[in-house]
Regions:
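N-terminal helix initiation/capping motif
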Residues: 1-40, 108-137
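Short solvent-exposed strand/turn elements
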Residues: 10, 17-20, 51, 86-109
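Short coil-to-beta-strand transition motifs
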Residues: 13-15, 29-30, 63-73
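Short strand-loop-strand
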Residues: 19-60, 91-93
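A residue-level detector for short acidic-glycine micro-motifs
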Residues: 24, 37, 76-78, 98
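Short, conserved beta-turn/loop elements at beta-strand boundaries and strand-helix junctions
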Residues: 25, 40, 79-85
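Short beta-strand-centered aromatic/proline hotspots
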Residues: 33, 71-81
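Short catalytic/binding micro-motifs of nucleotide second-messenger systems
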Residues: 59-62, 83
Length: 137
């Protein structure tokens, strides 16, 4: 019997450098101007600025391969110290608020041209789903 792996992401991250501007909602302090990967649901912002998990930020980014810019808000969901070999340096994981359908479609279609970003960590086992699968067998 195989163990089921946990997939916490709703969409595939793509390895692409993205021009952006990310600022705090309060005071409009610049947090970063470059992202290392992008998906329809979020980005990994290259930044050494101190932020809090759960903090709301304002994000503007250029859709790769276009001249179109997308404006949204995002929540800080992860901070990366940049100590792993696979890290590009300090970074901040952002989860976008849902994008309007036109922006979502544009981002999804343009990102298909870029390779996926593979996780640096091993995937976690979803024990609850594995137990449920065993119970059904």
């Amino acid at each position: 019997m195989e163990m089921l792996l946990s997939s916490e992401r709703r969409s595939v991250r793509r390895s692409v450098l993205v021009d952006c501007q990310v600022v705090r909602e309060q005071g409009f302090e610049l947090i970063g101007e470059r992202a290392a990967d992008l998906s329809q649901d979020g980005m990994l912002l290259l930044s050494d600025r101190a932020v809090r998990i759960g903090e709301e930020l304002i994000v503007t980014f250029r859709v790769p391969g276009t001249r179109c810019w997308v404006d949204t808000t995002a929540t800080v969901v992860r901070t990366v110290a940049g100590r792993r070999r696979s890290d590009r340096g300090p970074a901040i994981g952002l989860l976008f608020d849902p994008l309007p359908s036109e922006d979502n479609l544009l981002v999804r279609s343009m990102l298909e041209r870029f390779p996926p970003t593979y996780p640096a960590r091993e995937l976690r086992i979803d024990y609850a789903a594995t137990a449920a699968m065993i119970a059904l067998s």
